């Protein structure tokens, strides 16, 4: 019984050693691929964006519709960069300043689920910074298209 356990332990140690070596080789290959990718990316010039980068939003209610249209348009033409709701919300947050930036801090501090839900985040912004219901109906069609 003890001999069998010793043999089993020896086999496990040999397997562990082989897997460790294989893991090291794979990590080295990954490192080389990451370096090659970085080198290739430096050689490629990204196409110019037909939509200008959105302006920041400081919480001024009258600018909210403009901000939402600008950001939605920018994300639409750069959809490969904004592949999920969390990326879209993070992009919006990166453009907040002043009162709007202060407003979002508690959501970030408590890791609110709203940070992963683009539609809910927009609704919360509209509620906080004011939104005319007539404009909401028109702009909602644009956002749904996105």
UniProtKB/Swiss-Prot annotation:
Protein's gene: LDOC1
Tissues expressing this chain: Ubiquitously expressed with high levels in brain ant thyroid and low expression in placenta, liver and leukocytes. Expressed as well in six of the seven human breast cancer cell lines examined.
Pfam families registered for this protein in UniProt: DUF4939 (PF16297)
Expression induction or repression: Down-regulated by muramyl-dipeptide and lipopolysaccharide.
Annotated protein name in UniProt: Protein LDOC1
Quaternary data: Interacts with NOD2.
Function: May have an important role in the development and/or progression of some cancers.
Organism of provenance: Homo sapiens (Human)
InterPro entries given in the database record: DUF4939 (IPR032549)
GO biological process: cellular response to lipopolysaccharide; cellular response to muramyl dipeptide; maternal placenta development; maternal process involved in parturition; negative regulation of cell population proliferation
Keyword Membrane listed: no
Superkingdom, natural source: Eukaryota
Keywords from the UniProt entry: Nucleus
Major location (coarse): nucleus
Gene Ontology CC: nucleolus; nucleoplasm; nucleus
Cell compartment(s), UniProt: Nucleus
Lineage: Eukaryota, Metazoa, Chordata, Craniata, Vertebrata
UniProt similarity note: Belongs to the LDOC1 family.
Keyword check for Electron transport: no
């Amino acid at each position: 019984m003890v001999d069998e356990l010793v043999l089993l332990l020896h086999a496990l140690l040999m397997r562990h050693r082989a897997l460790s070596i294989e893991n090291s080789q794979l990590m080295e290959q990954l490192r080389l691929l990451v370096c090659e990718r970085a080198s290739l990316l430096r050689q490629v010039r990204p196409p110019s964006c037909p939509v200008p980068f959105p302006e920041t939003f400081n919480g001024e209610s009258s600018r909210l519709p403009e901000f939402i249209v600008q950001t939605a348009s920018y994300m639409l033409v750069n959809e490969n960069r904004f592949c999920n709701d969390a990326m879209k919300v993070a992009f919006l947050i990166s453009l907040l300043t002043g009162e709007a930036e202060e407003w979002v801090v508690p959501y970030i501090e408590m890791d609110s689920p709203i940070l992963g839900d683009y539609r809910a985040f927009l609704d919360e912004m509209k509620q906080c910074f004011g939104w005319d219901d007539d404009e909401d109906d028109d702009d909602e069609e644009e956002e749904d298209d996105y």
